[in-house]
Amino acid sequence: MAQRRDHITAAAQALRGRRWPVKEAPDHIPRTAGLYAIYSDHDAWGDLGYDCRADTPLYIGKSEDDLVERDLATHFAVDTSKPARTGSSTVRRSFAALLRDRLNLRAVARNPAKPGHFAHYALTPEGDDRLTAWMHAHLSIAVWPAPMDLDITLKKLETAMLIAFDPLLNLTKAPHPSPRLRAARKVMAAEARESAQAAGE
């Protein structure tokens, strides 16, 4: 039990600690399981429509196998040789919903050939590029690589961090998820549905 508390304390300290801008993060983040926290600069809070909560992460998540693949590749599209995949990233969908008007983003079906599950909306390629550029300009990352002797599941540890930090963009398990984010994501899902219906006419 004492070791478990130590892991919880260590994770919280790491997620409050050193952060790397998205573009620099690949040189510092290990390819291992662990937790990550996404932070923003002061201007980004205003872009997203929230009052600034300095030193509070916007989002906390986990990777069961590879922080680089889950965090940097999927959410932040740091590998420019691969297209961004908002349809596969709840983090990108949340940022897209809140930045829809500012970045002129349009939601589309994740799989245009077989549209459905519109809550998992994607963006047009041009919109994905604008979202990625904004994320690279404003966001930074802190990580906690999981140790080999971890005696608590990452899922439980993630839950403990969500309760401790209460990040705005986590819609489950955080004590106070943002109603405005939920509403904004519903707008995007409806737009993706309408886009698919128009394409099928």
Locations of the language-model features?
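PLD/PLD-like phosphodiesterase catalytic module centered on the HKD motif
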Residues: M135
